[in-house]
């Protein structure tokens, strides 16, 4: 479950943590996203938080958070595209299309997840 605490909205889907190099490298490649994947980055930066849609089968919703779990950017990433967030991020949430519509994240909103 992913919760926008600022708006009291939630997405009830499954959440997994990309807690290894391999999981972070593969992300949602070669998969139809049916769950959200949370990336915990070692540093809060823009470049290290950049993402790509190489080998992805569908577009995904992506939410970038700072070290205080506040939204710094939101996008929908199409397959075969590259995206660099507008601000430094420490956490990235990749999920199926519809995630954004469920929790309506905007700059500054506080987001939490539960596995």
From Swiss-Prot:
Disulphide bond pairs: none
A Pfam family the protein falls into: DUF192
Gene3D superfamilies: Protein of unknown function DUF192
Family: Belongs to the UPF0127 family.
Name of the protein in its database record: UPF0127 protein PH1112
Lineage: Archaea, Methanobacteriati, Methanobacteriota, Thermococci, Thermococcales
């Amino acid at each position: 479950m992913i919760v926008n605490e600022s708006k009291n909205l939630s997405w009830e889907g499954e959440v997994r943590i990309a807690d290894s190099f391999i999981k972070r490298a593969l992300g949602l490649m070669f998969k139809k996203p049916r769950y959200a994947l949370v990336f915990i980055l070692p540093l809060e930066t823009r470049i290290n938080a950049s993402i790509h849609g190489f080998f992805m089968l569908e577009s995904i919703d992506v939410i970038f958070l700072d070290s205080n779990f506040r939204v710094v950017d939101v996008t929908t990433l199409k397959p075969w595209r590259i995206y660099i967030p507008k601000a430094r991020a420490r956490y990235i949430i990749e999920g199926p299309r519809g995630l954004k519509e469920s929790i309506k994240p905007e700059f500054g909103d506080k987001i939490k997840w539960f596995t």
